């Protein structure tokens, strides 16, 4: 199942497709043909009733080969070469889940599930070094390519922080 697409801002013939289970496909000819990219090898940190999936992808407006992916019950990932290889951006999300207010377990065996339940991800041309992830526990911002994440503290405004979208 394909869950998300990102079209290259430099060359609209190049498209990445994100699937479930976590797989990335790439087309260089506007979708006429697709090539399965190397497996991102994101560790399974939550065992649940469904496979993790690539929910949303975003291309860095300043560095178009840099693409981030929000992964449902698997966190986030990053490529610096438009999908040829991927890096796991989730270890710090797991670390943050040790804080009691950032723990949530609904469908899996792990209290890190809420932090790893990525639904959307975005970047802005105004700040191309920052990426913002929407997950069950709120919005989290990284300025170091996903190595660490900062809680944007949505609880200041609402007792419910379940992030489903961000633009």
Which sequence ranges carry the predicted segments?
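Extracellular glycan-interacting surfaces
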Residues: 1-167
